[in-house]
Amino acid sequence: MLLNDSSTIACEVPVYLLPAEVAYYQRAGFTISIPRSHAAVTGHIDVLQLRNGYVHILDYKPDADKVMPLSQLVLYALALAARTRLPLKLFKCAWFDDKTYYEFFPLKAVYPLRAGDTAADT
């Protein structure tokens, strides 16, 4: 796969989000579904790509059409944004298997809708 892939920059990328970073994002108005803890949240990004001006975080999930790992992928995006100092608006997240591919913007997943906005506006 990687031999002819000009978009993938890394596989199995370890990421972590410190408790202070979780608190920072929560103070900034992000909705994050994670319990308060004194330990870092850790994980591994399966595939990291640069495509069309976005950093793509891809996670392989068997039976991708039966799972919804939004919280996990949002945490990975927040962790990578914290490490790289890139704004969250430059990230896209996706999960996939051999038959399906689902993609979303993590920024839309963490910001509550403002009064008068609809999901289509964001």
Go through the PLM ranges and name each one.
Residues 31, 96-100, 118:
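Compositionally biased, intrinsically disordered low-complexity regions
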Residues 109-122:
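Intrinsically disordered, low-complexity terminal regions enriched in charged/polar residues
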